[in-house]
């Protein structure tokens, strides 16, 4: 049993390691920096370059790619060479201090300088030292002597310029260049004020005595060749575990450690990607030797020359020669067999055509059945009977929805919940929408569903996700909404895809927008609507962090002559109104409770229900109310939002949240009152002070009773804020 466990563990680690070495870049990686293409194994961000080796990490600043901080990349190939620019090091003569010099060092990590580079010194009466640091330290250099300017067209042979070949050990992780000059430089300083030491690719620097000795023609960086490879092991050592992709092969690096990849003959591309090596079409690129009498046909990795019927290919000249003709045998049997085959094919094609027509008719009938079953006829009748109005419901087809979601591809899923699955859809006009595919529901509720579609399509509020239309030709109806790009409030507060950077101003504004939206739905919509599933996951944020209330799948319409409905309890734990949960009676105060939980989340940054918290504080409401009662609100408020200037606003918001989450619904304020109080929190301190002195005047101006806790009246001041708030709620947009 123990041996079996060890064997399984060994297989697990082997697979994990194989996955690591086979790692591939993300699909969204940046592929260019300025004019330089960036190909894997190099990359610009984490997950885009070969993992575990920062030598492949490219930093892109001002459209210039750099590797290892001070080496600018010009280009690189897949065979293990990188061409880059590195700065020179300089020493200048100064009469005060004799010398003013700088030395430069370069970090190499897993890169190494190619033997095709030369270490070069330009200057008179100077010498330069190259030092490497690693397991083996290495030093070399050269000296240049001259008291007068060298003659024009001089070579770099030790007079005004010297160069040397270097063989830098592979284990070197750092290289330093340092030029120096002799002490007495008065004889040369007028034509050679400074000396320069640098690496340069062989053939990329030609010494010009007068110009270079003066200022090196103002060149500050020189091209060099660097060698790179994958890891430290050979192809034999990593057989089956290298990162070479399909149609490629592994070869040992020429620098003595690691390996590189190359595409097989007949293929081209990036051999380090899983399918980077693609077939070369020799026929279209004219990389073939077929004669004019033969036809080139491309094959995978190669090609062949095809001769016309009646001729054969001469493999020496690759031309076509006539084939000796023979009289056909059994011509009668061939004719019979050919006729039988053709007849059989005609029968098969006819049967296939009939089956296709029957399948098309069946699908059409099924779509029509679903359309009627989902209330399509009722919807068309209601739309035609409504006459000219602001109802704008578009009925989409099943084919259009399938095409928009790429066949309901899992990669298009934006989210999943109790009400269904939401897909990202791209319509034929390239507009992006959110398509909600509901779960199978109660067929008896079709009329109510159609009513909700009609009512929701009339909601024209800037903080409600707009319903664009629906598709009724599927087994379950599809709803099409406008697409909101920046995720949900839950993602911003708790998710890993966003940094929690919402300021108090952002959070207060979001709370005001959501409260105003719910007040609009409760009080000013043509038919009052109770959302029934208010939570941070159903509040979307656009690119400006403007709140958009979404997911009305659980919503219910309240007839004008009723204040509440008896329904099957539905909602999300942590946000669910306890009174509604116990009685099944749904009214607008259920949304007030859920909004209070959302407000607590905005204030605390904590989840509504968290099993990682202690049992007594597992539910955010009890946790929050307890902190308020024990006067330790500061312990639960998110540290990113509270400061000395907004403590009063946060305390007032916390009080409103507690009022909204009272156990008895009748003790909770209405959303209209909540929206007014939250809007008032943005009033300046002077207005707050005025309202503290004249609370009756404030109450008269606001037109609503101010909420209070334990006799402490909250001032909301600002003589016109209620009118503004009411206008926002009533008009929507």
From Swiss-Prot:
Keywords: ATP-binding, Calcium, Disulfide bond, EGF-like domain, Glycoprotein, Kinase, Membrane, Nucleotide-binding, Phosphoprotein, Repeat, Serine/threonine-protein kinase, Signal, Transferase, Transmembrane, Transmembrane helix
Domain Protein kinase: 408-691
Record-linked Gene3D superfamilies: Laminin, Phosphorylase Kinase, domain 1, Transferase(Phosphotransferase) domain 1
Domain EGF-like: 231-278, 279-321
A Pfam family per the record: GUB_WAK_bind
Gene Ontology, cellular component aspect: membrane
Residues noted as binding ATP in the record, renumbered to the chain: 414-422, 436
PROSITE patterns in UniProt: ASX_HYDROXYL, EGF_3, EGF_CA, PROTEIN_KINASE_DOM, PROTEIN_KINASE_ST
Enzyme Commission (EC) number: 2.7.11.-
Tissues where this protein is expressed: Predominantly expressed in green tissues such as stems and leaves.
Description of what induces expression: Induced by INA.
Reactions catalysed according to its record: L-seryl-[protein] + ATP = O-phospho-L-seryl-[protein] + ADP + H(+); L-threonyl-[protein] + ATP = O-phospho-L-threonyl-[protein] + ADP + H(+)
Location of the protein in the cell: Membrane
Modified-residue entries (Phosphothreonine), positions: 397, 567, 572
InterPro entries named among the record's database cross-references: EGF-like_Ca-bd_dom, EGF-like_dom, EGF-type_Asp/Asn_hydroxyl_site, EGF_Ca-bd_CS, Kinase-like_dom_sf, NOTCH1_EGF-like, Prot_kinase_dom, Ser-Thr/Tyr_kinase_cat_dom
A single GO BP: cell surface receptor signaling pathway
GO molecular function per UniProt: ATP binding; calcium ion binding; polysaccharide binding; protein serine kinase activity; protein serine/threonine kinase activity
UniProt modified residues of type Phosphotyrosine: 481, 580
Cytoplasmic side: 352-733
Range of residues in the leader sequence: 1-23
Role description: Serine/threonine-protein kinase that may function as a signaling receptor of extracellular matrix component. Binding to pectin may have significance in the control of cell expansion, morphogenesis and development.
Family: Belongs to the protein kinase superfamily. Ser/Thr protein kinase family.
Protein name: Wall-associated receptor kinase 5
């Amino acid at each position: 049993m123990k041996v079996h466990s060890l064997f399984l563990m060994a297989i697990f680690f082997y697979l994990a390691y194989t996955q690591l070495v086979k790692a591939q870049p993300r699909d969204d990686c940046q592929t260019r920096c300025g004019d330089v293409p960036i190909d894997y194994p190099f990359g610009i961000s984490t997950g885009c370059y070969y993992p575990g080796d920062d030598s492949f990490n490219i930093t892109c600043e001002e459209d210039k790619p750099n590797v290892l901080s001070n080496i600018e990349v010009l280009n690189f190939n897949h065979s293990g060479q990188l061409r880059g620019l590195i700065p020179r090091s300089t020493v200048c003569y100064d009469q005060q201090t004799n010398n003013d010099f700088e030395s430069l060092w370069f970090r190499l990590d897993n890169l190494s300088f190619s033997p095709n580079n030369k270490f070069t010194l330009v200057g008179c009466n100077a010498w330069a030292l190259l030092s490497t640091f690693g397991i083996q330290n290495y030093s070399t250099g050269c000296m240049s002597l001259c008291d007068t300017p060298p003659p024009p067209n001089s070579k770099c042979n030790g007079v005004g310029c010297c160069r040397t070949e270097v063989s830098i050990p592979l284990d070197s992780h750092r290289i330093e260049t340092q030029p120096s000059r002799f002490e007495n430089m008065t004889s040369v300083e007028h034509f050679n004020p400074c000396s320069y030491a640098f690496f340069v690719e062989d053939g990329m620097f030609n010494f010009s005595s007068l110009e270079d000795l003066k200022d090196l023609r103002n060149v500050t960086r020189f091209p060099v060749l660097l060698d790179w490879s994958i890891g430290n092991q050979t192809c034999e050592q990593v057989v089956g575990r290298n990162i070479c992709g399909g149609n490629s092969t592994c070869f040992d690096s020429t620098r003595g450690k690691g390996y590189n990849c190359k595409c097989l003959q007949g293929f081209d591309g990036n051999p380090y990607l899983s399918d980077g090596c693609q077939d070369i079409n020799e026929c279209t690129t004219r990389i073939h030797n077929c004669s004019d009498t033969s036809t080139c046909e491309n094959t995978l990795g190669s090609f062949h020359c095809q001769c016309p019927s009646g001729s054969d290919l001469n493999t020496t000249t690759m031309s076509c020669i006539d084939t000796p003709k023979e009289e056909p045998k059994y011509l009668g049997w061939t004719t019979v067999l050919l006729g039988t085959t053709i007849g059989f094919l005609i029968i098969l094609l006819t049967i296939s055509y009939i089956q296709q027509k029957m399948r098309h008719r069946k699908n059409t009938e099924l779509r029509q059945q679903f359309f009627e079953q989902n209330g399509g006829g009722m919807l068309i009748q209601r739309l035609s009977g409504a006459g000219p109005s602001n109802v704008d419901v578009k009925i989409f087809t099943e084919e259009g929805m399938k095409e928009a979601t790429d066949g309901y591809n899992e990669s298009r899923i934006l989210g999943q919940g109790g009400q269904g699955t939401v897909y990202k859809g791209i319509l034929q006009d390239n507009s992006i929408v959110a398509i909600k595919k509901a779960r199978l529901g109660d067929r008896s509720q079709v009329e109510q569903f159609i009513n909700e579609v009609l009512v929701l399509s009339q909601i024209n509020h800037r903080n409600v996700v707009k319903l664009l239309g629906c598709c009724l030709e599927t087994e379950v109806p599809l709803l099409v909404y406008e697409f909101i790009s920046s995720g949900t409030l839950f993602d911003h507060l708790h998710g890993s895809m966003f940094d929690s950077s919402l300021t108090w101003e952002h959070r207060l504004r979001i709370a005001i927008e959501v409260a105003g939206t719910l007040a609009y739905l409760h009080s000013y919509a043509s038919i009052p609507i109770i959302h029934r599933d208010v939570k941070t996951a159903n509040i979307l944020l656009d690119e400006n962090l403007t709140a958009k209330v979404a997911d009305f799948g659980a919503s219910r319409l309240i007839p004008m002559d009723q204040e509440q409905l008896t329904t099957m309890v539905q909602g999300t734990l942590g946000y669910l109104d306890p009174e509604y949960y116990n009685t099944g009676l749904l009214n607008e105060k259920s949304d007030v409770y859920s909004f209070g939980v959302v407000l607590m989340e905005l204030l605390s940054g904590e989840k509504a229900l968290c099993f990682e918290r202690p049992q007594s504080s597992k539910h955010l409401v009890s946790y929050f109310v307890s902190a308020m009662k024990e006067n330790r609100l500061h312990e639960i408020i998110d540290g990113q939002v509270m400061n000395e200037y907004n403590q009063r606003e946060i305390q007032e918001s916390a009080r409103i949240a507690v009022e909204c989450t009272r156990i008895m619904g009748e003790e909770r304020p209405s959303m209209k009152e909540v929206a007014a109080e939250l809007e008032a929190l943005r009033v300046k301190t002077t207005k707050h002070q005025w309202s503290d002195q004249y609370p009756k005047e404030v109450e008269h101006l606001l037109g609503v009773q101010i909420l209070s806790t334990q006799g402490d009246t909250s001032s909301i001041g600002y003589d016109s804020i209620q009118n503004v708030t009411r206008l926002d709620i009533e008009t929507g947009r």
